[in-house]
């Protein structure tokens, strides 16, 4: 799964990973893992991230071809 969280963080005033983590009540390490594609967030966390970044879940996360198999 491809993530666009980093792009949206910078479009929303260059939020740091820690600032975003604080906004959604998770650790910075969780944000790092999501951005690197090492961790898929729960539906609830994905919705919260989208709300805080003023976008949609679909804009934050994209399935890649390999994810369809």
Regions from the language model: what does each represent?
Residues 62-69:
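Short, charged recognition helix plus adjacent turn
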Residues 26-39:
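Recognition helix of helix-turn-helix/homeodomain-like DNA-binding domains
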Residues 44-59:
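DNA major-groove recognition helix of helix-turn-helix/homeodomain DNA-binding modules
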Residues 18, 29, 58:
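Key DNA-contact positions within bacterial/archaeal DNA-binding proteins
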Residues 4-23:
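Short basic helix-loop element that most often maps to the first helix and adjoining turn
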Residues 36, 55, 65:
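Short, conserved catalytic or interaction motifs in soluble domains
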């Amino acid at each position: 799964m491809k993530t666009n969280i980093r792009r949206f963080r910078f479009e929303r005033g260059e939020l740091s990973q820690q600032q975003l983590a604080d906004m959604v009540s998770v650790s910075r390490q969780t944000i790092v893992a999501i951005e690197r594609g090492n961790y898929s967030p729960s539906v609830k966390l994905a919705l919260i991230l989208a709300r805080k970044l003023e976008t949609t879940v679909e804009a934050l996360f994209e399935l890649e071809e390999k994810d369809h198999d």
